[in-house]
Design a protein with these regions (language model features):
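Fe(II)/2-oxoglutarate
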Residues: 2-141
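Active-site environment of non-heme Fe oxygenases that use a 2-His-1-carboxylate facial triad
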Residues: 96-98, 105-148, 153-340, 344-380
Length: 380
């Protein structure tokens, strides 16, 4: 048993020690009041929406009292209007800064080609994917863990590919339309509309927020080559973090401009997106987005020249890791096999090809994919 009075964040930090062997509740210097400007919110009983910070609650206090640490009784917090809110110690621990630093937001399995192939991740049959929550959940679990997933036995048309894509998300309309459909006809000012090989890259880095998920479906190929290249960018970045943390840190700090200028036929676009190559959550340094595209990277003029030189050294280290053959997963896309790619994580490319090759696909809104996963009980 221990007496306690303090601010809400202090209580949350103290709750991390709930259930320790000596049965004590370490308060870590609690002050007795919620600090000025702290937000204590009340949720609507039906909608769950928080109505914003209640004015005047900067003076709310955590009652001094005794709690049995063994059963983790709720901690009461009294507002100046007399309203009392009770917080469970488990909830306080989970939502404290110290608690968040220890948690992974998105559990993942980082992979190279050998790791992925040995995992023998199954594809999902189209009908099971479309008609059952179990099939959908299995697909999303694979997608969240590995950043790629396949649906088999899809009717090879743009219309049926759209039905499959909309199973997990709203389609994100971009300058390429909703469902894009392309061959090597140079109809757009993009290297994808050629027969040339494409190096590994993130798509739409020139958007302020790159598209979250990309869908590919090869409808027809009468020729040779054209295999799809997939590389886990997070695995490569983690190798850089382990071998040269100063490179990782620099790539996560220096903002870059990516630019796309198109003047082909009736398509006139000038897109610019700005952001670091590696994006991390500031509280736990967890990587959540890689923005790697040497085709669309613009002039680096956002930092002093000495930093630019250091950045190129760091970029060279990451590029070397991304281009290691052991990190390259090559997949031959065929009619009936749709590929979903986490564009924030997995880089994709293509080998050169001959003959007539026809692909369709789209971009999906990331928020809706993650929402679908959470509604099925997955951590996303």
């Amino acid at each position: 048993m221990q007496q306690l009075a303090g601010n809400l964040e202090g209580v949350a930090a103290a709750a991390l020690n709930c259930g320790s062997n000596d049965n004590t509740f370490r308060t870590r210097g609690l002050s007795g009041h919620i600090l000025g400007g702290s937000k204590v919110q009340r949720a609507h009983p039906q909608t769950g929406d928080e109505g914003g910070a209640c004015p005047g609650l900067a003076g709310a206090t955590v009652w001094a009292g005794q709690w049995d640490v063994g059963d983790c009784a709720p901690v009461p917090v009294a507002g100046p209007d007399g309203h009392v809110t009770r917080y469970g110690l488990e909830w306080l621990a989970k939502n404290s800064y110290e608690g968040q630093k220890q948690q992974v937001v998105h559990p993942r399995i980082l992979w190279n080609a050998e790791i992925y192939q040995q995992a023998q991740v199954p594809s999902i049959d189209c009908q099971r994917f479309l008609q059952t929550d179990e099939g959908l959940k299995e697909f999303l679990q694979s997608f969240l863990l590995y950043g790629i997933a396949f649906v088999e036995n899809v009717t090879p048309t743009k219309e049926h590919t759209e039905i499959v894509a909309k199973r997990i998300s709203i389609i994100r309309e971009t300058i390429y339309g909703r469902m894009w459909y392309f061959t090597s006809d140079f109809s757009r000012g993009d290297t994808a509309y050629t027969k040339l090989a494409l190096d590994r890259h993130t798509d739409t880095t020139y958007f302020q927020e790159p598209c979250g998920i990309q869908v590919f479906h090869c409808l027809k190929h009468e020729g040779t080559g054209g295999r799809t290249l997939l590389v886990d960018g997070f695995h490569a970045a983690e190798q850089v973090r382990l071998q040269a943390p100063e490179h990782f840190e620099l790539l996560a700090k220096v903002p870059l401009r990516h630019e796309y200028v198109e003047k082909v036929g009736g398509c006139h676009n000038h897109m610019i997106g700005v952001g670091p190559l590696l994006n991390v959550y500031p509280w736990n340094n967890e990587l959540y987005l890689i923005r790697y595209n040497n085709y669309d990277r613009a002039v680096i003029n956002t930092v002093p020249h000495p930093v630019v030189r250091r950045w190129y050294h760091a970029h060279r280290a990451l590029t070397a890791e991304l281009r290691r053959p052991r990190n390259e997963l090559w997949v031959k896309l065929k009619p009936g096999k749709a590929l979903f790619v986490d564009n924030w994580r997995v880089l994709h490319g293509r080998e050169a090809f001959t003959g007539y090759r026809q692909l369709c696909g789209c971009y999906l809104t990331r928020d809706d994919v993650l929402s679908t996963a959470r509604l099925l009980g997955l951590q996303a």
